[in-house]
Amino acid sequence: VLDVNVGLPELDEPEMMALLIPQLQSVTDLPLQIDTSDPAAMERGMRLYNGCPLVNSVSGKTESMEAVFPLKKYGGVAIALTLDEQGIPATAEARLAIARRIVETAARYGIPKEDLVFDTLAMAVSAEPTAARTPLEALALIRSELGCHTSLGVSNISFGLPQREKVNAAFFLMALERGLSAAILNPNSAAMMDAFRAFCALNGQDANCQAYIAAMAGETSAPPDRAPAASAAPDLPSAVIRGLRESAVQAAQAQGPAAQAVQGGHQILVHPAAQHLLYHIHGLLKVLLSLPREA
């Protein structure tokens, strides 16, 4: 699915959406998601869309539902956010209550729950310890209590953390286990796609693991190289900082060829990179010393 969002300042969003939707459908077969908070832009996009549009989004706010649900005449599926006038609830049960209210309101407009995909709103776990658990619990409740499809912005969970892809992949698997229907993620991420293929193979969604095997056909099964054994000897920076002369000499020698000299009975080791720099400094000093001094 290709997300289409034209919400830029000082831009006529309805006009731009009307221009862009036909142009995109002329160059790609991907389904389009009409992503806008402007009901007029949403209607223009849905009216011109060739097929069944996916719109993002409606929420539990009364104003939002009253603006979006009348557009059912164009057909389509809506992403439904589990938030309302009070914001994003802190508990899974409260998010379920919003989802239930959206389903009931949609039904009054003739919209079946099958045309709603609920986003239980994953936020950064670095800022809120329950940011992962709550949307997952809400997702499971919506699947079991309402029987509705679900979606998550998976990468939101890792914002502010190092090695985000690892966190994203783990969260993605946790969500899939709870019945996630669709995810906003990077399809070019090998870690994410490998996790998805492995899950499908293990969960009986990949007959005879054929898709997994085909995807891994070019991968090597050789184990990764072992990490070098830890050495008791400190590395060069540590030895210098700690004032360990002999260890510093040994560490410098272990790093490869070095320029060596003897001065005052002490061995001086110069790494090739430093030797190159010293060469240029020496040349510069020669030039400076050759210049006539000011009177």
What feature does the model see in each segment?
Residues D119-M123:
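Active-site pocket-lining segment
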Residues V262, I268-V270, I281, V287:
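Short hydrophobic transmembrane-like helices used for membrane targeting/insertion
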Residues A106-G110, L278, S290:
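Short, exposed beta-strand "edge-strand" segments with a Pro/Gly-rich flavor and a Y/T-containing core
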Residues V1-P9, P14-M17, P22-D29, Q33, ...:
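ATP-dependent carboxylate/acyl-activation modules
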Residues L269, Q275-L277, L288, E294:
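Short linear/disordered segments characteristic of secreted peptide precursors
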